């Protein structure tokens, strides 16, 4: 019998201690952007910090998309093969679109044309689980990308920014087996300061491929959901143009000290939706 983590104890422990890599503080005041595009550049531009990561399952009455920026839902999918692109497009995207509309009350939701299935042994650096705290999009350029998603969807409606607000969400789900190691950790969006978010590039040269990373701040609160099961989906916010809502929920994977030595490798699927809301007047 394998010595796997006992998932019935998902409400324990209350917290774990681990290390999370953050972009180096030296980049805070630089006009040039850091570049992280492979293992070597990640090591050169990040520093590990000792942190306490709280068990979010104990705070079920506290988490929501507009406050802390994340929520955990139960969802039984009809999809049995997450490696089949046609099945993902024809079945999983429509399933999740229905969920995000119900969760947010958005006027409309548009799926991103790409998604990621992550594993420990990926085809390239960006298909691996991330090992540094990051945001998937830049707060400075994401609204242009949101409009691009609407246009590419073939929508007959237009959503000018003076009349509509936008929010980006991730759906993160384990596949093949429950999460026994390398779970996802999130920063509670209520503890993220805008001044701590800086842009970076995901390529070695040029001025394309821009995203964002948070700098370490001792006031940040870190949370995770231990032992995520196959019928659980972690929904979290990427960005939001509504000023009264939380802005962003940075995230990464981390080494769980409670994982068994022979724990199964984590596999997960990550898809994204852009939602539109009429501006409140």
Per-segment meaning from a language model:
Residues 6, 15-212, 219-220:
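Non-heme Fe(II) oxygenase catalytic core, chiefly the N-lobe of the double-stranded beta-helix
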Residues 211-281:
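Catalytic core of Fe(II)/2-oxoglutarate
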